[in-house]
C-alpha cells in the first residue's frame, strides 16, 4: 500500500500532520527498525506506532521490538494494521493472501539471524507495557 493512500485515514483519525513521519529511505524492515528506534531515542519519543499490512505487522513488530530491547529503551510500541486492504486482489505488491506464506518463512529466517525478538520476549514486553 502506498503512504499517499494511508495518510488520509491517519489524518481523519485525528493524528496531526506534524506527528506523521513517513520513513522511505530504508530498504527493509530491519533498517526501518534501526532508524526508527534511533530517531525515537534521539527525540525522546516514548511511543512508536507501527503501521503495516496485517500479514507484515507481526514480523515488523518483532523486528522493532528486537531493536527496542537491544537499545534497552522504554519505548512503547503500538501496532496499527492498515485497514480496508483486500486479501485476494493485487495491491501492487502482489496478492496479500499469497504473500502470507512468505511472511512465515521470513519470520523463521530472521528469527534465526537474531533480527526478531523471541515470542517469550514479546510476551514479557507486552506484560511490561500493560503496567505502564
What are these regions (language model features)?
Residues 1-95:
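A structural signal for short, hydrophobic/glycine-enriched beta-strand patches
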Residues 89-132:
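A structured, mid-to-C-terminal "fold-capping" secondary-structure block
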